[in-house]
Amino acid sequence: MALSDTDVSDVVDSLSLDEKCSLVRGAADPEGTATGYVPGVPRLDIPELRLADGPLGIRIPGRSSTAFPASIAVASTFDPELARRQGVAMAREAKSSGQHAVLGPGLNLVRVPNCGRNFEYYSEDPVVTADFAAAAVEGLQSEDVIATPKHYVANNQETKRLVVSAEVGERALRELYLPGFEAAVEAGAGSVMTAYNRVNGTHMSDHRRLVTEVLKDEWGFDGYVVSDWFGTASAVGAATAGLDLEMPGISLEALHEAFGIDPDAEMLAEGDDESIPAGETTTPKFATELKPAVESGAVPADRLDDMVARILGQMARIGLLDGEWGDGGALDTAEHRDLAATLAARGTVLLKNDDGALPLSDDADVALVGPGVAEAMLGGGGSSEVTPAREVSALEGIRARTDGSVAFEPGVERVVTPSFFDGGDADSDGDAEDFPGGKTPDVDAAADCAREADVAVVVVRDATTEGADRETLRLPGGQDELVAAVADAADRTVVVVQSGGPVELPWRDSVDAIVESWYPGQADGDALASVLYGDADPAGRLPVTFAPEDSYPTAAEERFPGVGEEARYDEGVFVGYRHFDAADADDEPTYPFGHGLSYATFEYGEAEVRGDDAVAVEVTNASDRDGREVVQAYVRPPTVAGVERPTRELAGYAAVELAAGATETVELTLSEHAFRRYDDSEGWTVDAGDYVIEVGRSSRDVRAETTVSR
């Protein structure tokens, strides 16, 4: 039985000042397995606490674990239950390696399409983000592992992430950037990680209003707040603002030694030397400054007690303090491998499919083109990097599935994701030994190969990483030119895009089909083959908007990357589809939020309001094959003088599997978030009037409407 709050309080009272200070800062893990480590107190039988990186899988140096698809791919399923199952699996893998907390999920909104960590986040929409946040937290914590949603808050770019100030209004914070974290807290998250950046001038580690007044007092968060690594701005400021645990608690040199990182290698910065901790920033604050601050009264003694109690309270909740933690660990199981494959397939989005180009026939002769088809696309660079025990490339998956021939040409040199941990070295020399069969990069050879096949499948990818933002939304390494050359030569061209977020597709009108598979993880080839050959319906829908780079609101320099040390969020709540759907928005998206095709055809009946918070619609699979539809409901608010609101906001969605010819009544619960708005003076308010409920297949594909009054 977990210790009670009274028991934890008694333990805190038994600790010396030195022992208390040792529990609120990290140290070097003697086993070398944990990203973050808190030493125990043997005198009182308080065990160690280990924290592992984990948005895409459990990262343990020198060990393997299941490499799940990127979070943006998971959100593309529009099925939070799958995120819950992933959380369960990741918790079991954490336990198998002796890790008590997982540093995830990542809950920052996709505000900047160029952001290098968009692959770690769910969506540009706060409702989707909140739903998946809650599901992931519930899954992780159901197995007695502490979830750590991050990075609180407004960490929407990597450029100058240590110093940039997100100059953001309260309405945008409340309506867009905070809901995911609030949902995680409501789901019982045991920890929250603060971001590197500043918000309205104050570093998040020292932001008392957001950390104590909003997170702890307003939302009732009773867990501990942990800093990002070297993300503590000051000892006194952070402790009194509400930070409970400083990580890593040791110097950068000691961290390098603990993880075997070459101290002479410069960690990736992509021309932005303030993206990575350096100099004074890497000096631990609590190690030398906290105890004197408590002794002088600068940090109240009861604040230190609260810090310790919050950490011990979560250790008690998962059974660490009474010796009941540890059962249920499992690593690289068949169940986890199957889940990784299911997530990858269901997160695959069919953007375009002219004249039934897909699915492929079993006996089609395929020209498989692309520099990365011989290796699985596991993820982006940074703290989310995972080493799987097994992985399946596109080449392996398609060859195993087809009855036809498969010819391979790389076309261009390999695009390698830079590693955040090896100095950013990315070997892209395209030497022959890099490719199966001694192939060398040659666009003409790729075009010739495509010309001889029934269909050309071109697999292209971007390269994103923590610590740097993409300079452009175009694909790197001449891949756009490769697609154009193949499309010009082939009878039928299918392009598979593996990206960490929105990309520009300048060749889209020249190809027959486009598939977005994001970073599919270890099951890359198996999942791709199942979708291309129709064994699985391409069930994913876009959780972000695809559009030309200069049409996003963050195309303005003052908004991204910012001028000096400020990024102005003066687009307010008009982010993503909210921007593109605005009445005065001239730019049309390439593919709208919620878009995704199916191999089946679906018909919608009339929409019907049910009660105060639900809408129902009949959906029919009008084709001769089974399919999976994602039914979406958007709220269009009434016009209120002097108030700018988005044209529509997502209110609910449901993924439904329908057999050929089947009809089902789908009921969607409508989130109150879509009806209300935040007023700086009055707080949350719902304007009186008629709200139009739009039901359809995307934010732009409305199939039925009804009205509800508030």
Question: Where in the sequence are the language-model features?
Answer:
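Glycoside hydrolase catalytic-domain context in secreted enzymes
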Residues: 1-700, 705-710
